[in-house]
From Swiss-Prot:
GO terms under biological process: endoplasmic reticulum tubular network organization
Protein name: Uncharacterized protein T19C3.4
Main location: membrane
Biased composition (Basic residues): 188-202
Protein origin, superkingdom: Eukaryota
Subcellular locations according to the entry: Membrane
Biological source species: Caenorhabditis elegans
GO molecular function: microtubule binding
Renumbered residue ranges of the record's region Disordered: 179-229
Similarity remark: Belongs to the DP1 family.
Length: 229
């Protein structure tokens, strides 16, 4: 028999049927049935704990291991064998009665220790959460500062570029002024030449006029004709 089939039979016969019978005992308020199924659940809880341990040790090599588990469950449930009642009265109840005080003390210490441990974990988690929130806030502030620095640096770069372009324009204007000054300094020479040429031309014109005046003076004037009466 496979492990899956045995597990299915154990769950069906060992839990569902006893759960329904326990419901019937509670609903009818039958004290005898109630005690009977309470003893079964105590024994079945101990069996479930031991089963998980034995499966790690016996499941791979012990012959008919899964079949024996099914037989044991039916032995506990059977009204003829009354296996759960026998185990509870012969072994479980005397053992629990002997170690009841030790078990209660162990449970109480475990309860207090678990409470203290829970409080420690809670305080540590609060401190950790506080640190995480503070670190997140610091990171957010740092990112904001970095963004502001980037924006300021971008503005500075833009202003530097504007100043640089202004300086370049000023230098170009100064160069243009210097070039115009040099052109103005070079330009009077041809003007002087032109003025000298104009002066020479005026002189020639004046000399020509003088010569014409002298020739006109030297030519004898013709006598005026007398009018004919």
């Amino acid at each position: 028999m496979s492990e899956t089939l045995s597990r299915l039979l154990i769950i069906t016969a060992g839990t569902l049927y006893p759960a329904y019978r326990s419901y019937k005992a509670v609903r009818t308020k039958d004290t005898r049935e109630y005690v009977k199924w309470m003893m079964y659940w105590i024994v079945f809880a101990i069996y479930s704990f031991l089963e998980n341990l034995l499966d790690l040790v016996l499941a791979f090599w012990f012959p008919f291991y899964f079949q024996l588990k099914i037989v044991f469950i039916f032995w506990l449930l059977s009204p003829w064998t009354k296996g759960a009642s026998i185990l509870y009265r012969k072994w479980v109840h005397p053992t629990l009665n002997r170690h009841e005080k030790d078990i209660d003390a162990l449970l109480e210490s475990a309860k207090s220790e678990s409470y203290n441990q829970l409080m420690r974990i809670g305080s540590k988690s609060l401190v950790y959460a506080k640190d995480v929130v503070a670190e997140a806030a610091v990171r957010g502030q740092q990112q904001l500062v970095n963004q502001l620095q980037r924006s300021y640096s971008a503005n500075d770069v833009g202003s530097e570029r504007e100043a640089l372009t202004k300086n370049i324009n000023i230098v170009k204007i100064e160069e243009l002024d210097e070039n115009s000054d040099t052109d103005l300094q070079k330009s009077p020479r041809p003007r002087r030449r032109a003025s000298s040429r104009s002066r020479s031309r005026s002189r020639t014109i004046d000399s020509g006029a003088d010569s014409e005046f002298t020739t006109a003076a030297t030519i004898p004037r013709r006598s005026a004709r007398k009018p004919i009466h």
